[in-house]
Amino acid sequence: MSAPHDFIAIGLGPFNLGLACLTEPIDELDGLFLDDKPSFDWHPGMMLETSTLQVPFMADLVTLADPTSPFSFLNYLKEAGRMYSFYIRESFYPLRAEYNDYCRWAAAKLASIRFGHQVTTVEYDESEQVYVVHADHLPTGEKKTYRARKIVLGTGTPPHIPEACQGLGGDFLHNADYLENKAALQAKDSITIVGSGQSAAEIYHDLLQDIDSHGYHLTWATRSPRFFPLEYTKLTLEMTSPEYVDYFHALPAATRDRLNASHKNLYKGINSELINEIFDLLYQKNLHGPCPTRLLTNTALVEAAYDPASATYTLGLRQEEQGQDFTHATQGLILATGYRYTTPRFLAPLTDRIAWDDAGRYAVARNYSIDTAGRDIFVQNAELHTHGFVTPDLGMAAYRNSCIIRELLGREYYPVEKSIAFQEFAAPAGPHHPVEVSPV
């Protein structure tokens, strides 16, 4: 039997791919990366031609941990012969399709990645003190078994379907499947988008451009009271920092949950330029008469029904501020309702080794571990409730990976920043004395 790997990473989105790139030059670490997809593919249903990342190119797989890495976005541009074109373009923000191609380029250089491997079970062997990972090799159906001392989970967040649409018939779809169904949607008489974030805005803008040539009626319903822009001011961006994560993680769970609810416009808002482009396009479309489109704010989806005979959805909506219910009929239905983490079924044998909070979520330690010992199982993008809104941020991925690598190695390999912000988030340390008020 071969020696166990130092770690096995399960799932290969940008976060674990960054870990693969950053551990590649570390001879002391033997890692294996397993993913069920046939190749790297990041949100293929939202690869709109003009869509860009919402973070600058420096938030690539490696640069903020190791600017000299051969896996940097700039090195990708150089090898692709587009360095000067990107420079002349004068935008810090890569196209989303370009970022996906960059990730594919990086993945192709790594021998530690195994695509087409669907993990079925992870167990712990007490006698050998290793994790045993069972996987199906999808192209051949062969059963595979791997062993490792530590596990890193990067299985991503699946599309969230609201309760009102659970079990709903017809051909409604989540925005994750938008592009492959776009032509079929545009053949319908009416299309409705439900959701409030960047994906909903991008799809609305995309469909609004073609509304004249296809003749459909287009509706966008959002529960938010307005179309919130993504807050991107510099002092706010300092909250994507190690010290804010320190501060947030130390807060009581109830406070963290309350803050996360109030932080949605920090990571779920809409690019302000896109909001303005939508308004300008609406202005153009209304020059020669009313454009067949509606924008509904403060509008929650309460229930939904599907009539196969007419291929029509009837949505039960509620205007939240007025408390008034109404219905809306549509043939096409797109749910831009986000993604939510679910615990992978393959972890069931490890339930007793994992630390859980009172709400049944991972009790994620500051070092991103979830096992009760705090040193064996680590998570990527599953710690929103413990580490805050920076969890899905590509810009903090290299920092998190540097922290995880420090735990895997037992020492710091990439310098881990501890303080980068000008502002202070917590009260000063040390004894605090009440202010003495002198009598007047």
Language-model segment annotations:
Residues 1-38, 42-44, 86-198, 202-440:
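Flavin (primarily FAD) cofactor-binding/catalytic cores of flavoenzymes
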Residues 64-97:
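A conserved beta-strand/loop capping segment in the N-terminal third of enzymes
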